[in-house]
Amino acid sequence: MHANVYIPEEFLTHIESIMPSHLDMASFVASCQKPLRKSIRVNTLKISVEDFLVRAKEKGWELEPVPWCETGFWITADESEAPLGNTAEHMSGLFYIQEASSMMPPSALFQGEADYQAVLDTAAAPGSKTTQIAALMNNRGVLVANEYAASRVKVLHANIERCGVRNAALSNFDGRVFGGWLPEQFDAVLLDAPCSGEGTIRKDADAMKNWTYQSVVDIADTQKDLIESAFHALKPNGVLVYSTCTLSTEENQQVCHHLKETFGDAVEFESLESLFDNAKATTTEEGFLHIFPQVYDSEGFFVARIRKLASVTPPEVKKRLGKFPFEKASKKAQQEVAEQLLGALDIELPSDTQVWIRDKDVWLFPEALEPMIGEFRFSRMGIKIAETHKKGYRWQHQVATTLATGNEANIVDLSIEDAREWFMGRDVRPEGLSGEGEVLVKYNGAIIGLGKWVGNRVKNGLPRELVRDKNLF
């Protein structure tokens, strides 16, 4: 597949100068010319690994565990009839197609830690690591998912929506703003930094077309600014994971050492040599993971885990925020929403959430977001659960996909034919059934959306960004 991969001589000379002595250039080049193995991560917000393995076996998928992620697997599957992304399991949010190496930074962030209340993902799109973090948080606390490129926020939101994430707040800023705007607000920060992408050759034969050593030096300056900002945003005793999909020490070890030189004893490097079996094979003397592609048959990657041992003085910023357009619901109003939701769909509001109102829209925010409200501008927070109208509430899609358990009384089960129609955005007519009002829609054990009975027809409530129109399961 990638035998014709472009690898500049200058790049090979550079890699040879930084490659550990026990590795060789011939195996590096050979691995760069091999296509990546396809990998997926089970989304435990929707299904347990055990139940997913049963499904995979039924479908004839062969899975091999990814050693650094309990929910990750390399997959061999027949995609001749429908690609993995168009299977019902994928569209239902049961799994995420994610490169195995990219599962490592969230695993490192949560190593030995279970109870983060506020987490920042500084460069979040398209959402593989964000949704992995949300699953590790079990949808509790608040997860701020930031993406600098406005064009990528839409796909980030679509993936968060598909995977049933309800504790996220999305923002669209340069990651360098967080240290000044939200100093010492987060228990954990993931900085998967923009980089020269030297480790991505195996999935992009032209990844090195524009590579120069000067571009490495230039982007390292940006990375140093980003890691300082991320460190400022971290609470004392909080954990920062810095990662890249590149190999140059200028963008990796040197960026981490810059942080240590800047903040001294407040910075502690924590070793990742026990993160998984054979992690020692890529562990540096500082305890970082510097992964060349031939070692684990993966992308090239770098991961560092850093603890903040003491408070540091944040940069001063002048904030100019407009009026916050939401109003927190009164206890009485929140209780009314909860009662109506329980009556209509047999769904309970989680105890760690708050109802907020914007005009006629009803939103559910993570309770842990409240300290940041008024301090920062988010592009989207929590989930929209309803629109108010004369007769009460019109419930929204994410109520079904993020709050329903699948054991509710008000459910319609679809056949495979009707499920295909549903994912194509069409209304369905379940055989021999009729009803009234809103109804949870289920296929093969998974809640896939919210519909409304109109006689014997269920009106489709699938958001446009989740509709697929061809080549389905």
Curated annotation (Swiss-Prot):
Q: Answer whether the UniProt record assigns the keyword Nucleotide-binding to this protein.
A: no
This entry's Gene Ontology molecular function terms read:
RNA binding; rRNA (cytosine-C5-)-methyltransferase activity
Q: Name one Pfam family in it.
A: Methyltr_RsmB-F
Annotated EC: 2.1.1.178
State the superkingdom. Answer: Bacteria
Protein family (similarity comment): Belongs to the class I-like SAM-binding methyltransferase superfamily. RsmB/NOP family.
Name of the molecule in the record: Ribosomal RNA small subunit methyltransferase F
